[in-house]
């Protein structure tokens, strides 16, 4: 299929052209069967050879984060939306103007030739929003990696106009403490006047190696 067949070819061409190549993939639902999972494993093995960074999202974990009832009808729609959010989050790290900007060079520094990656998004409101958003971002139940001992970390913080310096520092410290002591850590911050007493944090952590994976079965659908 497009994921298991075409994506590794496209990734190889991009890598040969010197283009930063990031794979965001989903694993099959359990009800899709063993054959589907086997095809996924073959596809991910081929893709892994040609991407700089790889983020894996197991469809089976959607039930832990979706507020909707997971039905046969909407299961694949929810999975596709998660993939969209992943691509959008990385794109916005580069393209959205912020008080403290992240640019393409920042993303490249962390994600080039970096192996398995963790991506998490945390959103929280109220008095403890900095701590809660940071904890959610580093422990997303969707991602089959953890960011412990990561060698590269990108932190993007978006907050309401009343966000304090101490809150930014608290969130950044919580996330940084999860990474390797010598990790490259790059962060950006943006104020959003449409938010009210809210903080949103996107974390991308790389350089995890195979030890960053909680499971070894790879992906099914590939962007």
Predicted feature descriptions by range:
Residues 1-223:
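Tubulin/FtsZ superfamily GTPase core signature
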């Amino acid at each position: 299929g497009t994921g298991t067949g075409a994506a590794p070819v496209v990734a190889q061409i991009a890598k040969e052209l010197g283009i930063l190549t990031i794979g965001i993939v989903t694993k099959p639902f359990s009800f899709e069967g063993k054959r589907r999972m086997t095809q996924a494993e073959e596809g991910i093995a081929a893709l892994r050879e040609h991407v700089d960074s790889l983020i894996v999202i197991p469809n089976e974990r959607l039930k832990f984060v979706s507020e909707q009832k997971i039905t046969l009808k909407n299961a694949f729609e929810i999975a596709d939306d998660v993939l969209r959010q992943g691509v959008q989050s990385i794109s916005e790290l580069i393209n959205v103007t912020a008080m403290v900007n992240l640019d393409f060079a920042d993303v490249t520094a962390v994600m080039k030739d970096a192996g398995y990656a963790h991506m998490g998004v945390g959103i929280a409101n109220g008095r403890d929003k900095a701590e809660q958003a940071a904890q959610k971002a580093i422990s997303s139940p969707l991602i089959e990696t953890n960011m412990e001992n990561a060698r590269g970390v990108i932190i993007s913080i978006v907050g309401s106009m009343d966000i304090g310096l101490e809150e930014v520092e608290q969130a950044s410290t919580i996330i940084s403490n999860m990474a390797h002591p010598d990790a490259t850590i790059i962060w950006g911050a943006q104020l959003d006047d449409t938010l009210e007493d809210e903080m949103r944090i996107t974390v991308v952590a790389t350089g995890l190696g195979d030890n960053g994976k909680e499971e070894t079965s790879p992906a099914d659908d590939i962007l």
